Each structure stands twice: as structure tokens, then as C-alpha cells.
């Protein structure tokens, strides 16, 4: 009896144990279904060779960009210079056309005089051929009128020639031969530029080419801004070098500090805002 009761108890205990299994034990989860979403640090770690090549590429791109910007600014200045030269040439062409028209009009005005004189002489000779005395008087009157018209025509020619060739000597183009001449011409053009507020009109007023002034500008700027550097460059000797070579040496003598002063004076219109024709 005791054995049967113990078996029944164990069976009951077993049954209760089997029923309580799903509630007491934790569910078994497969660890393979969980994946890490955070990236590994090893994936972002690049080799040192790749990093150095990328840095070199960025430096080269920056250098090319800087060179492109400098070239763009130089081209912009060149365009402005060419536009001013174009305006100057247009003014010269307009002046030439207007002077040619005036000469043609003067020529046309002076031409009909002899024709009228010939017509008057022919009419007087043909209309009164029957009367010798009247014919002679008409011929003498025609000759007097012809001589008077001839004198007027000569006076007109003389006045036109004086107007054509009587240009003031101050407006004639002069060739500078030394540094003092370059400085004197530069100051004259600068004064005209400050009055007229136009580079092309200032060059036209003094009958000087823009490129000629630009090639000798470093000499004048060195004498105005930094005359103490003239000892480094030396005096100009026409027997040893040309004026263009001396101007290039003056350009190379302009250091960064002097160039900053020059640019500041150009912005304030105290120097001619003209670009250099030399390169370092």
C-alpha cells in the first residue's frame, strides 16, 4: 500500500511538473538571428598609403584652382586693357573720318569757282560779240573778276593749309630717352587722367600709346614710391642697355611691400591704374 501510494504521488508530481514546464522555463532563442547593426571600426580604417594619396590629390586640386583663379583675374584685367585700347582706336578713327569729310567739303566748295568764272567769260564774249568795245570791256571785267577769285582761292588754300598743319607742338608725339623723360611723361598723363577720369582720353590727349606707357611704368613707379631702391637698380646708361631692359630691372626691384603701396596709390587714383607687361 505504501508503494502504491508513493507511485501515485510521484505520478501526480510528474504530471504537475510536466504542466508547469512551459511557464517556469525561459524560451530558447537562437543566437544566430541577432546581427550587429553597428559598423566595425576595421572597415573605416584606411591604409596610410590611401590617405596620403587622397591628401596629395586634394592639394593638387587646390593648387589648380588657385592657378585658375589667378589666370581668370589676369584675363579680366587684359580684357579691360583691350577695351580701353579699342575705345582709343575708335576715337582716332572718328577723328580721321571727320577730318577727311571736312577736307572733302572744302575741296567741293572751292571747285565751282573756276567753272562760274568760265561761264561768265563765255556768256560775256558770246552775248556782245557784235560790239568790239563792249566785248573788250567785258573781257577786262572778266579778267579782273578772275584775278580776284584767284586771290580768294589762294587765301582759302593758305588758310586751310595753316589749319591743317598748324598743330601745337605740345600735342606732338615725343620719344623719351631716359628715366627722367619717362617720369615727366608719366606725371603729365597722370595729371590729365585725374582731370578727365579716363585712361584712354588721357593717352589720346598726349598722343601716347597705352602699351608704350605700360612698358615704362615700373621706372616711374619706382622713382615715385621707392626712390631709395634706385641705388640697387643703378642709373640708366643708354650705351649699355635699352630703356625696356632698364624698366624690367626696375620691375624686378619692386618687392611685395612696395607693390602693396603701389596698389593702394592706384586705388586712390594717385597713380595710373595700368597693368604691367612684365612677369616674374
UniProtKB/Swiss-Prot annotation:
Coiled-coil ranges (or none): 63-101
Keyword field contains Transmembrane: no
Keyword DNA repair: no
Main localisation: nucleus
Keywords: Coiled coil, Nucleus, Phosphoprotein
Composition bias type Low complexity, residue spans: 133-146
Compartments where found: Nucleus
Ranges where the record places region Disordered: 103-176
Motif (Bipartite nuclear localization signal): 151-164
GO CC list: cytosol; nucleoplasm
Sequence ranges of Basic and acidic residues compositional bias: 103-121
Residues carrying Phosphoserine: 130
Compositional bias ranges of the Basic residues kind: 152-168
Oligomeric and partner information: Interacts with p53/TP53.
Record's function text: Promotes the degradation of p53/TP53 protein and inhibits its transactivity.
The protein's name in its UniProt record: Coiled-coil domain-containing protein 106
Species, as recorded: Homo sapiens
Gene that encodes the chain: CCDC106
Amino acid at each position: 500500500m505504501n508503494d502504491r501510494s508513493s507511485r501515485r504521488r510521484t505520478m501526480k508530481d510528474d504530471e504537475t511538473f510536466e504542466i508547469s514546464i512551459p511557464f517556469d522555463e525561459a524560451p530558447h532563442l537562437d543566437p544566430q538571428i541577432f546581427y550587429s547593426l553597428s559598423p566595425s571600426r576595421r572597415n573605416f580604417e584606411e591604409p596610410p598609403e590611401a590617405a596620403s594619396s587622397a591628401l596629395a590629390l586634394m592639394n593638387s586640386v587646390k593648387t589648380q584652382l588657385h592657378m585658375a583663379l589667378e589666370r581668370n583675374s589676369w584675363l579680366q584685367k587684359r580684357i579691360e586693357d583691350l577695351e580701353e585700347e579699342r575705345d582709343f582706336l575708335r576715337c582716332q578713327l572718328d577723328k580721321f573720318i571727320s577730318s577727311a569729310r571736312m577736307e572733302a567739303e572744302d575741296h567741293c566748295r572751292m571747285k565751282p569757282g573756276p567753272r562760274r568764272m568760265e561761264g561768265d567769260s563765255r556768256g560775256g564774249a558770246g552775248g556782245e560779240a557784235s560790239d568790239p568795245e563792249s566785248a573788250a570791256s567785258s573781257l577786262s571785267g572778266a579778267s579782273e573778276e578772275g584775278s580776284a577769285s584767284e586771290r580768294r582761292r589762294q587765301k582759302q588754300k593758305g588758310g586751310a593749309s595753316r589749319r591743317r598743319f598748324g598743330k601745337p607742338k605740345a600735342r606732338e608725339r615725343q620719344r623719351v630717352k631716359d628715366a627722367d623723360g619717362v617720369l615727366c611723361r608719366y606725371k603729365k598723363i597722370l595729371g590729365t587722367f585725374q582731370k578727365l577720369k579716363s585712361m584712354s582720353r588721357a593717352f589720346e590727349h598726349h598722343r601716347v600709346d597705352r602699351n608704350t606707357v605700360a612698358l615704362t611704368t615700373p621706372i616711374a613707379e619706382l622713382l615715385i614710391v621707392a626712390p631709395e631702391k634706385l641705388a640697387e637698380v643703378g642709373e640708366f646708361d643708354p650705351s649699355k642697355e635699352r630703356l625696356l631692359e632698364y624698366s624690367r630691372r626696375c620691375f624686378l626691384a619692386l618687392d611685395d611691400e612696395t607693390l602693396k603701396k603701389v596698389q593702394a596709390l592706384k586705388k586712390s587714383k594717385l597713380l595710373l591704374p595700368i597693368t604691367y607687361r612684365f612677369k616674374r
